Amino acid sequence: MRNMLSESLVDNYKGRNELNIVRIYSGDDGESHFEDVEVEMENRGQVGRISELWCGKGVMFREVEGDYEIDFHNAPRRQLVVNLTGSVDIEIGDGTVRRLGPGSILLAEDTTGRGHISRAVDGEPRSCLFVPLD
């Protein structure tokens, strides 16, 4: 039996030709900014919709406790961050906060400048997958 979150993710992408991810990047002003990015998907019939190949350098898994808060920091490299369990609030310098839940994908590119804050949500631990990109 599928859970409600899985069903809502499937319903969100049903019949669409793109997948939405959140990008965080360093602006010319030295601050991090958010951008919503649509990843184009090609319909391949029975095998589903598939994007172009993104080249990665491996995979890292991470778990954090539900009380973490990491003050302003930069992404250590350009990478995809895929939330597996739990949620994270990401805050940028102007006070904007994005909440990323399970199944959310972040393209982290704010490797310079002030960076962003990451904090746990509702005391829940979180697990995620890092995919460093070329």
Please state what every model-predicted region is.
Residues 7-25:
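Short acidic, Pro/Gly- and aromatic-enriched capping/linker segments at domain boundaries
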Residues 27-29, 83:
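Short, acidic, Ser/Thr-enriched surface-loop or helix-capping motifs
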Residues 38-47, 57-75, 110-113:
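Conserved short histidine dyad/triad with adjacent acidic residue
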Residues 49-53, 69-75, 91-92, 98-99, ...:
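Short histidine-centered beta-strand/loop micro-motifs
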Residues 63, 93-111:
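Short acidic-glycine-tyrosine-enriched beta hairpin
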Residues 63-66, 73-90, 129-132:
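Short, conserved beta-strand element in jelly-roll/cupin
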Residues 105-111, 121-134:
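A short hydrophobic beta-strand segment most commonly corresponding to one strand
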